[in-house]
């Protein structure tokens, strides 16, 4: 992981440890949005991983889908 990825994953981890316990479980998906964000950034890099995480967070609301939604695999052609 490069420095940008480490910083972003670290920020998500701080959220998971400091804020998430106080807010309670709100996510409609498995894995949770924060776990999805960490995995997306680790797999796809800081820019694309952040974009995937932001799209996922935008879908995590009442009236949208729910359930199992894994991070897409890395396309080896790119």
UniProtKB/Swiss-Prot annotation:
It is found in: Cell inner membrane. GO terms for cellular component: plasma membrane. It is a peripheral membrane protein. It comes from Thiobacillus denitrificans (strain ATCC 25259 / T1). It comes from the Bacteria. InterPro entries: Membr_insert_effic_factor_YidD (IPR002696). Could be involved in insertion of integral membrane proteins into the membrane. Belongs to the UPF0161 family. Keywords: Cell inner membrane, Cell membrane, Membrane. Its main location: membrane. This is Putative membrane protein insertion efficiency factor.
